[in-house]
Amino acid sequence: MKILIKTANAYICVHDRRFIMVKEVNIRKVAVIGCGFVGSTSAYTLMQSSLFSEMVLIDADRARAEGEALDIKHGLPFAKPMNIYAGDYSDIVDAAIIVITAGAAQKPGETRLDLVNKNVAI
């Protein structure tokens, strides 16, 4: 894939001399996939950074993502305004950055290789 034109929020790409993509990117939008300990901490830190105006949280448990979005919104009085919400994969097609924190925790006696195989499935 080769990028022919790169602007502030659009990319035009070709592959094998064929046009394959024009993608609008919202440079002020970030997505966090996985709302466990790492994901929720990452989302809170991203909110505090004031780099983004929109954040989408995705988790296999939709209610957990909604709860984390509400919890993070409570910190907004100390940061710049941001639209934070639980969404799905269709909401992040234009995100500038996607942070993937989804994964299983390592159990006692489980090898790192076993954990990797489990996380590949996730």
Predicted regions and their residues:
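A short, basic/flexible loop-to-alpha-helix module at the beginning of a structural domain
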Residues: I20-R28
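Glycine-rich Rossmann-fold phosphate-binding loop(s) that bind the pyrophosphate
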Residues: C35-G36
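N-terminal Rossmann-fold NAD(P) dinucleotide-binding loop
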Residues: G39-S40
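Conserved N-terminal Rossmann-fold NAD(P) cofactor-binding segment
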Residues: I58-A95
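Conserved NAD(P)H cofactor-binding loop of Rossmann-fold oxidoreductase domains
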Residues: A102-A104
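Glycine/threonine-rich flexible loop motifs
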Residues: K107-V120
